[in-house]
């Protein structure tokens, strides 16, 4: 017996990508970014993730081949490995300040060519619930209106 559930995607916004590294490697990779990523140890999302495909296409376009040292399904785990100086990792630029506050890493570069999109998923075609409406509008305004 299948479930008959309808779900609707509501775009909250999109963000470029920020690249992070741990000191002292950050200085090495910040200089000549993004060319400095060539051969650099990279922590990547798994291959079934849209961000992974976007990063690989961008690397190919700019002719850069980082060395993938680990793949992650879990973003928090990837950041923890990055903080432990295992490699460079990415996070949406929209939450860059949060990453800098929580992890002992620094920004080595950014790309607006690689985008991540964020959605609210609801059972309603048009969001009517007042609390959900406030949350989605706050995300659109506070996170994605730069």
What positions do the PLM features span?
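Secondary-structure junction motif
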Residues: 27-30, 41-62, 128-136, 146
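Hydrophobic hinge/microswitch elements
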Residues: 48-106
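A late-sequence structural motif
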Residues: 26-27, 106-146
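Central regulatory/effector-binding core of bacterial HTH transcription factors
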Residues: 1-5, 71-72
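Short beta-strand->loop
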Residues: 8-18, 89, 93, 101-115
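Flexible hinge/capping segments at coil-to-helix
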Residues: 6-47
């Amino acid at each position: 017996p299948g479930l008959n559930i309808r779900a609707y995607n509501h775009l909250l916004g999109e963000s470029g990508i920020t690249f992070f590294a741990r000191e002292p490697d950050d200085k090495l990779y910040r200089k000549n970014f993004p060319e400095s990523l060539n051969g650099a140890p990279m922590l990547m999302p798994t291959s079934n993730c849209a961000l992974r495909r976007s990063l690989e296409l961008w690397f190919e376009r700019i002719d850069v081949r980082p060395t993938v040292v680990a793949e992650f399904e879990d973003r928090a785990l990837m950041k923890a490995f990055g903080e432990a100086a295992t490699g460079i990792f990415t996070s949406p630029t929209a939450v860059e300040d949060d990453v800098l506050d929580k992890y002992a890493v620094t920004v080595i570069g950014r790309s607006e060519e690689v985008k991540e999109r964020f959605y609210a998923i609801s059972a309603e075609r048009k969001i009517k619930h007042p609390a959900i409406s406030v949350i989605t509008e706050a995300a659109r305004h506070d996170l994605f209106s730069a």
